[in-house]
Regions:
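Alpha-helical transmembrane segments that form the membrane-embedded catalytic/substrate-binding core
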Residues: 154-164
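Short, glycine/acidic-enriched loop or turn micro-motifs at the edges of active sites
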Residues: 15-17, 122, 160
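Conserved non-catalytic scaffold segment of RNase H-like nuclease domains
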Residues: 2-112, 138-142, 146-152
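Short alpha-helix plus adjacent loop in nuclease-associated cores
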Residues: 116-134
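Substrate-binding/catalytic groove segments of enzymes
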Residues: 131, 146-147, 171
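Acidic two-metal-ion nuclease catalytic site recognized across multiple nuclease folds
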Residues: 2-3, 142, 162-185
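Hydrophobic faces of stable alpha-helices that mediate helix-helix packing
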Residues: 133-136, 140, 158
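Non-catalytic alpha-helical scaffold/packing segments enriched in small hydrophobic residues
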Residues: 99-103, 119, 160
Length: 185
């Protein structure tokens, strides 16, 4: 697998729940690893009356005060500035892509069809005998990746996900009975 930093950006979203149809997209973060350029943007509450995930992502209703909807001009600039039309967008799980797709659809924003996502969590195979310990944080600790934090900010998660992607080095992981096996590609 190609690990050239200039071929990727990392996307992380913070949300108000797990349903991209019922829960708000609270923030969007995009990290360009070769330049270390970072985009981090709060969005207003629309679908929910309050923020229910503050203990996970640290985002409060006060943080969102004055936040504005994403505009088509901002989307176009983001696609251009972060070269999203030519880079693969890395995500750790399918939630990020799903929330972006449904936000674009709800707001009538164009450009989602230009984006190419790769959910590298698909390279991690875990059995039902793993005891629920296969978290991004635990994998980062296993690979000695620093700066794992209790609060999951989009900006920090983007950097952690990039470091984890590099450490996996294109290998698939098999996790069973709390043991981790790297499988060669």
């Amino acid at each position: 697998m190609n690990l050239c930093a200039s071929d990727y950006v990392v996307l992380d979203v913070e949300t108000n729940g797990l349903s991209s149809l019922r829960d708000d997209l609270l923030s969007i973060s995009v990290y360009q690893p070769d330049t270390q350029k970072l985009y981090n943007r709060f969005l207003p509450l629309e679908l929910n009356s309050d923020v229910y995930t503050t203990d996970i992502n640290g985002i409060t209703k006060k943080d969102l005060k004055g936040a504005k909807l994403l505009t088509q001009e901002e989307v176009d600039a983001l696609i251009t500035d972060y070269e999203l039309q030519r880079r693969t967008i890395l995500t750790y799980g399918s939630l990020d892509e799903r929330f972006i797709r449904n936000y674009f659809k709800r707001k009538g924003l164009q450009g989602f069809d230009k984006l190419r996502f790769f959910n590298f969590k698909r390279n991690i195979i875990s059995s039902r005998f793993s005891g629920g310990n296969i978290t991004k944080d635990n994998l980062c600790r296993l690979y000695s990746i620093d700066n794992v934090q209790a609060l999951h900010t989009g900006a920090n998660d983007c950097i952690l996900e990039w470091e984890l992607f590099k450490k996996l080095d294109g290998n698939k992981l098999l996790i069973t009975y709390d043991k981790v096996f790297e499988l060669n590609p």
